[in-house]
Each structure stands twice: as structure tokens, then as C-alpha cells.
Regions:
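Acidic, surface-exposed loops and disordered segments
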Residues: 1-201
């Protein structure tokens, strides 16, 4: 993928708003041999059941109520789309392991933030991430944001030598969608509007 396109996408996304213009984002673009090496390290760590050391808390420590139900429904729908049964643990494992190869896309984006930044900056970061995703569509590209790519920051530091003053927030896949791939027909359901919005006229 041309570097010029990647640069243009990030150039457009960097106009995302941030509190007092802090612009807390820092991006590393990983391709080619570097991506292959890092993907191998991450997948090996996952398959060997290495304990994740994610620098940023992402999921709740205890799943409850509607969040637990949505998570379960999401997994069941994804596996049923792929024809993976509850009993087929190996195929489930292989599907999850693909996360660490960035689903074999040509570009892996990794996102870092200075350790001094607080919760508000992560909100800013979300706007930046979605701006990248929307900008990519303009160039016929697809994306997939991934928390999984942030689970082994020590291995990422080993390969990419990023500063100890920074945290690895997450990653993102960037590439051309394979429309013939079954997984790309999967869409997670969204809640009805009346379950998430209240009006006070």
C-alpha cells in the first residue's frame, strides 16, 4: 500500500478535536518484514497462553447485565457466521489468533499515548481513531480497530523500541476488504435507539 495514502489518511484524521488541543495521539505504521516479525511474536505469545500485560484497562473485570449479554451474543453470532461450533475449540482459537496477525492485512497501525495523559485524552483518541476509519473509506480501504494488538506491549517494545514514557493503546488493521471472505459479512447488532437515548422536551 502506498505510504502516500497512509499519510493522507492520518493527515486528515489528525484534525480530530482534542481537549485544549493536546493532540495525544502517536501512530506507528507497521508493514512488510516488521509486521511479519511482530505478528509472529504476538501470535506465539497468544498461543502459548502468555499472560497479557495490557497497559490500558479496556474490558470490565467482571461482566454483568446487558454488557455480558451483548458480549455473548456477539461471539455466538460471529462463530455461527463462520460455521464454528461451540465444541470446536481449535477453530475458535485459530480465529482469535488471527487478531495478532492483524487479520493478514498489509498494514498494522499501533497507537500510543503519553503515560501522563488522563481519561479525557482517551476520549479524544477515540475521535482520532474513528476519523482514521472514516478517512480510509474515502480511499476504498477498510479498517478494524483491535484491542488485541495492545495486549503484549512488552513484545511490541522489543520489536519497535517505543519510549517507556508511552502506553500502547490499541491497534488497527488497514487494508482492502476481501468481500469473498465469510467473516466480512458479519455485522454486530446495535441497540435500539429507545434503549440508549432519553429526551426531555
Amino acid at each position: 500500500m502506498p505510504v502516500a495514502i497512509i499519510n493522507t489518511i492520518i493527515e486528515q484524521a489528525k484534525t480530530a478535536p482534542s481537549g485544549v488541543n493536546t493532540q495525544p495521539w502517536n501512530v506507528t505504521v507497521v508493514t512488510g518484514k516488521s509486521k511479519k516479525n511482530l505478528s509472529s511474536l504476538l501470535e506465539e505469545a497468544f498461543r502459548s497462553e502468555k499472560k497479557p500485560t495490557m497497559g490500558c484497562g479496556y474490558y470490565p473485570t467482571e461482566w454483568k447485565g446487558e454488557y455480558k449479554a451483548r458480549r455473548k451474543a456477539c461471539g455466538l453470532l460471529m462463530y455461527s457466521t463462520l460455521g464454528i461450533t461451540r465444541e470446536d475449540k481449535q477453530r475458535q482459537l485459530d480465529q482469535w489468533a488471527a487478531n495478532y496477525r492483524a487479520f493478514d492485512a498489509p498494514v498494522m497501525l499501533l497507537f500510543f499515548i503519553d503515560k501522563v495523559m488522563e481519561v479525557g485524552s482517551y476520549m479524544d483518541y477515540g475521535m482520532f481513531l474513528q476519523s482514521i476509519m472514516l478517512s480510509a473509506v474515502e480511499y476504498g480501504l477498510s479498517t478494524c480497530p483491535q484491542a488485541a494488538l495492545g495486549k503484549y506491549p512488552d513484545l511490541v517494545r522489543q520489536e519497535l523500541f517505543y519510549s517507556k514514557d508511552r502506553k500502547l493503546v490499541c491497534g488497527m488493521v488497514l487494508g482492502y476488504e476481501d468481500k469473498s471472505s465469510t467473516i466480512n459479512s458479519y455485522r454486530a447488532p446495535c441497540e435500539e435507539l429507545n434503549n440508549m437515548v432519553r429526551y426531555f422536551p
